[in-house]
Amino acid sequence: MARRGRVQLRRIEDKASRQVRFSKRRAGLFKKAFELALLCDVEVALLVFSPVGKLYEYSSSSIEGTYDRYQQFAGARRDLNEGSTSINSDENASIHSRLRDITAWSLQNNADESDANQLEKLEKLLTNALRDTKSKKMLAKQNGEGSRSRANSSGSRGQEEGSA
């Protein structure tokens, strides 16, 4: 049995062919949305605007209710991000301050002429600053991944339909 080749993704130039393809793909997308809602017991809302601006919509419940839920989720996520941004800016200011102190200390105490004790002190400061930076980086990565996984599991479903 012959396999079909991959469909090359590019704009279809012929207007009639483009309209036929749009209709078929739209029907397939709506069928998938229905199946997803039915099989997985999830809330799905799908809005599609045709090239001429006609609206096609599907919702497993109500579009308005789903949109309201999305707005609440997006608002809570935005508030969370704004709160973490202010915390991060305070932490960044602290790190920059420590870095300025270390730089000033190393300039004052010319590292080439320093004794072993002074160099050990500088090494300890730099090691601590590096450790703190790495831990903050790890925490930021974990928070970023956590918010993405929460977004995928708690109701943000627009990304999955758009990427299909």
From Swiss-Prot:
The keyword Transcription applies. Widely expressed. GO terms for biological process: flower development; positive regulation of short-day photoperiodism, flowering; positive regulation of transcription by RNA polymerase II; regulation of transcription by RNA polymerase II. InterPro entries: MADS-box/MEF2_TF, MEF2-like_N, TF_MADSbox, TF_MADSbox_sf. Disruption phenotype: Late flowering under short day (SD) conditions. One of its GO terms (molecular function) is RNA polymerase II cis-regulatory region sequence-specific DNA binding. It holds the Pfam family SRF-TF. One of its GO terms (cellular component) is nucleus. Its main location: nucleus. Residues 133-164 are annotated as: Disordered. Probable transcription factor involved in the regulation of flowering time under short day (SD) conditions. Functions as a promoter of flowering under SD conditions, upstream of EHD1, HD3A and MADS14, but downstream of GIGANTEA (GI). May transmit a SD promotion signal from GI to EHD1. Functions independently of MADS50 to control flowering time. Plant over-expressing MADS50 have an early flowering phenotype under short day (SD) conditions. This is MADS-box transcription factor 51. The lineage of its organism: Eukaryota, Viridiplantae, Streptophyta, Embryophyta, Tracheophyta.
